[in-house]
A protein has these predicted regions:
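Histidine-dependent nucleotide/RNA phosphoesterase domain, centered on the 2H-phosphoesterase fold
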Residues: 1-209
C-alpha cells in the first residue's frame, strides 16, 4: 500500500503491491481441502479477520492453498548448511534438489491416521497463524516418527526440528499498522479465540506430499 511502511514479509514472499513473489523451494505439506472438517473453521477465521483488517495491512491466503507444513524442505534463498540437505552441495540447482527429494520421498513410510487439535491463534510474528498440536500421545509419536523418517531420507534437519510448531497460515502482514488498527485486530483475535477455545476443533491430517 503506497506510502505505508512495509514489514519484513515484503521482499521475501510478497511484493509491495501484495502480489506473491517468486520464492522457489520445496516442503512436505498436508493439504487442507474442502472436505476436511477444519476447512470451514479456517475459512471462518479468515473471513472474520478480513472484516477487521479491511484490506489495510494483511494479505490473506486463498482458501485453495490451505495446508499444514509437516516438515520444512529447502528454498533457493536460504542456501545455508543448517537449512540444506546434508547429502547435497549448497550450490546445486534447485531442479536437481527437487529430483533428488522426489526419489527419496518415495522411501518414506506413510503417516498413520493422525489428528491435530486447536491450540491458539498466533499473531506474534507479522503473520496470522492458527496453531495446532497433536490430539494425543499417539498422534505426537506418529508425527515424530514421520518427521524423523523424512529428515533421514532427505537429509534435512532444521535447528527447530524437535520443537517445530504446527500451524495453518491464514495471512501475512505486509504493512505496519497504526495503534488503532492494532487494537482492532487484537480485539478480533480475542473474540475469535474465545469461540475456538469453547470447542477446540480438531481434524485428521491428509497424507503428506
Amino acid at each position: 500500500m503506497k506510502g505505508m511502511q512495509t514489514t519484513s514479509n515484503v521482499g521475501r514472499k510478497f511484493n509491495e503491491d501484495g502480489s506473491v513473489r517468486f520464492f522457489p523451494g520445496n516442503t512436505i505439506i498436508s493439504k487442507v481441502l474442502e472436505d476436511n472438517e477444519i476447512y470451514s473453521v479456517i475459512a471462518g477465521i479468515s473471513k472474520e479477520f478480513q472484516a477487521a483488517d479491511q484490506g489495510r495491512s494483511y494479505q490473506f491466503l486463498p482458501l485453495a492453498s490451505l495446508h499444514m507444513t509437516i516438515i520444512q524442505g529447502v528454498c533457493h534463498e536460504d542456501r545455508k548448511k543448517q537449512l540444506w540437505s546434508r547429502y547435497l552441495p549448497l550450490d546445486l540447482e534447485l531442479e536437481k534438489v527437487d529430483e533428488f527429494f522426489e526419489e527419496k520421498f518415495k522411501e518414506v513410510k506413510s503417516l498413520p491416521e493422525t489428528r491435530m487439535i486447536y491450540d491458539y491463534i498466533d499473531m506474534s510474528n507479522k503473520n496470522i497463524l492458527v496453531r495446532f498440536v497433536p490430539e494425543n500421545q499417539q498422534a505426537a509419536e506418529n508425527l515424530k516418527k514421520y518427521r524423523d523418517d523424512v529428515s533421514d531420507k532427505l537429509g534435512v534437519r532444521f535447528p527447530d526440528h524437535d520443537s517445530y510448531g504446527f500451524h495453518i497460515s491464514v495471512a501475512y502482514q505486509l504493512w505496519e499498522m497504526t495503534e488503532a488498527e492494532k487494537e482492532k485486530m487484537q480485539k478480533a483475535c480475542e473474540r475469535i479465540s474465545r469461540s475456538l477455545e469453547k470447542n477446540r476443533p480438531s481434524f485428521s491430517l491428509r497424507q503428506p506430499e
